[in-house]
Regions:
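Compositional signal for N-terminal targeting/processing segments
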Residues: 17-395
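N-terminal Sec-pathway targeting helices
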Residues: 1-12
Length: 395
């Protein structure tokens, strides 16, 4: 009898432990160096698209992004990384992690400014993809319209480097050969690129004859470049977007359309995207003038009812940086991940993470939010211009 009682008691303890372990947690501290703790939160979300809103060029955000992405790849089957980059940038990044381009190749990577955390993520992806079947590899897609002229130039030279254009007419052959051999970016920008755009607009069949399956990549880069120029025009040719202006709305439309196209081309894949936090909100909530939030962001449209991602989207907002403990002497900037449906904001008198939205439930804006222990100590990443991949390896 005593043995039966002990067995029953042991079973009850195990059952209680399992219930406690499996029950969704309201918060969890995350180890930025290892990612430990993420599984205790996100394992309950079986979404198809995970979107993270970051503060650009901040080390702690990049560390969390890396840990989160690795977890989603290994535990959730995510295989597509969506980037806030133009199509040309994403294409060259993808060629690198597919191990078709080396990290110090002449095409593209001398155009990038990247950090140690970026390098570590791309190197990890490259190693992950080695000796895997194509269907199991990680790929990268840029869905923004922000390619620089240098990136478009590098992309065109790379795409056309070994092509045989003989199936196209003579005029198309001459244009593509000139682009292939062009050694001066200014000539490409002023002469060859306008001709490529005209060909794409008036006679795309010749591009398809010349490039076959590769034509679609050139067409999307040319389309993205045109959209980027239109956005620049709508912004009165200013480098920084006016948050309440028509350029922002135009860019959000492009982000939405491009992500939808990528999803519809591969509707069974799982995706992770890292974007500026202003783009990542599930519901509009800020009406104040000068707000850093974007009205009608592309994510808010994807999260709406009857959207193509309705019920398949998980949003983690990293813009929330209220102080959650007294500022101390700690060297580590601890990060806590909160489930907005279960947790109350410990750093706000209102008890809400989104204090500027008193009438909107937190969970309708993002399913998860991040709070740093010392938000004033979040550090800027050490960016490295030029051939970073090669330079970093040699350090």
């Amino acid at each position: 009898m005593r043995r039966k009682f002990l067995a029953f008691a042991l079973s009850l303890v195990i059952l209680c432990a399992l219930v406690f372990e499996l029950y969704p947690r309201s918060s969890q501290e995350i180890d930025l160096s290892t990612g430990a703790g993420i599984s205790k939160m996100l394992r309950y979300e079986n979404a198809q698209v995970y979107l993270f809103g970051e503060i650009h060029r901040c080390t702690e955000y990049q560390q969390f992004r890396n840990a989160l992405f690795k977890y989603l790849v290994e535990k959730k089957g995510v295989r597509v990384l969506l980037m806030e980059h133009g199509y040309a940038s994403g294409f060259l990044e993808n060629e690198t992690v597919q191990n078709r381009l080396s990290f110090s190749d002449e095409y593209g990577y001398d155009q990038f400014i990247v950090s140690k955390e970026d390098y570590e993520l791309f190197r990890w992806m490259s190693e992950f993809n080695q000796n895997r079947p194509e269907r199991d590899k990680i790929s990268i897609v840029g869905i923004d319209i922000t390619d620089s002229i240098g990136m478009v130039y590098a992309f065109c030279r790379y795409l056309l480097r070994d092509c045989d254009f003989s199936a196209a007419d003579t005029k198309t052959q001459m244009l593509l050969i000139s682009t292939q051999k062009c050694q001066f970016q200014q000539r490409f920008e002023n002469s060859l690129l306008p001709q490529l755009i005209e060909l794409y607009q008036t006679n795309p069949e010749q591009l398809e004859l010349a490039l076959g399956d590769q034509a679609i990549h050139l067409e999307r880069v040319l389309q993205g470049w045109q959209q980027g120029q239109e956005c620049y025009k709508l912004n009165d040719y200013q480098p920084d977007l006016q948050l309440d202006g028509p350029a922002v709305a135009y860019r959000e439309d492009a982000l939405y359309a491009n992500l939808r196209r990528v999803y519809e081309e591969n509707p069974t894949a799982k995706y992770f995207g890292s974007f500026g936090a202003a783009h990542v909100q599930m519901e509009n909530y800020v009406q104040k003038e000068g707000s850093s939030r974007i009205n009608n962001s592309f994510v808010s449209r994807m999260a709406g009812k009857n959207s193509f991602l309705d019920g398949r989207l998980t949003v983690i907002d990293g813009a929330i940086t209220h102080e959650i403990r007294e500022l101390g002497e700690a060297d580590t900037n601890h990060l806590t991940l909160y489930n907005t449906a279960l947790a109350k904001n410990p750093g706000s008198e209102s008890g809400k993470f989104y204090a500027e939205a008193p009438d909107t439930p937190d969970e309708k804006i993002a399913q998860y939010v991040l709070l740093f222990e010392h938000p004033s100590q979040v550090t800027a990443s050490e960016d490295q211009p030029g051939r970073y991949w090669k330079n970093y390896k040699e350090k």
